[in-house]
């Protein structure tokens, strides 16, 4: 693994900090967790989690719910897309794994949701979408936004097993590799996916980070389905307070 003086922030609307020399594939001394809960009222001042320095790099995972909103009656709207993008912009995320995206769906004006999110942030992101399944004449799947300033060397997608179509997004930058995904609800599919993810990560000689909605938890009976496999190569770097408020054992989003 390459040494670096930079700091990585892991964000799933919960924050932790670690040196780049302590990548997601190994435990590291000096790790400190932010342990801050989810956003209850938009992007307030206390929710910005300022970076400690200009050289800090912030990683993030965020399930978009197709930008339908999480209050009132869920509905697709430009306002919801802009609200979603505002969180990313406020946190100044350098690279973001996003789940539940659509592209070209006839019932959603054939929008390219990931590109719309990127445009709404006003940040110079490279967009990487992984079409995982057919939906209403278009595609749905996960994606990644990565700042071009990180020096993107390569991007690719890897098919994963599942009752629904699943994909892994791989983004290699100058300093590290970032994997973004949304794993299946089927236990065996998640176990098989974890093996594939480990194999992909072992193909690189630099720090590798995995981020996404894993539909799995290290707190579940037996350590979950995917985690006993993933923890052979990865260590949890994000907060584990809980994906949903009031449900501390229901963390399923991780970096």
Where do the protein language model's features map onto the residues?
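Bacterial N-terminal signal peptides that target proteins for export
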Residues: 1-9
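Solvent-exposed loop/turn segments at secondary-structure junctions
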Residues: 64-68, 101-105, 132-136, 150-151, ...
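N-terminal, active-site-proximal structural segment of metallo-dependent hydrolase catalytic domains
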Residues: 22-120, 134
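Bacterial N-terminal signal peptides
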Residues: 10-19
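Active-site beta-strand/loop signature of hydrolases that rely on acidic residues for catalysis
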Residues: 58-64, 84-110, 178-181, 193, ...
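Stable alpha-helical elements in mature extracytoplasmic
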Residues: 77-84, 97, 110-113, 117, ...
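Active site of divalent-metal-dependent phosphoester/diester hydrolases
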Residues: 109, 126-146, 161-164, 215-255
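Beta-strand-turn-beta hairpins that frame and shape the catalytic cleft
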Residues: 48-60, 140-142, 147-152, 163-180
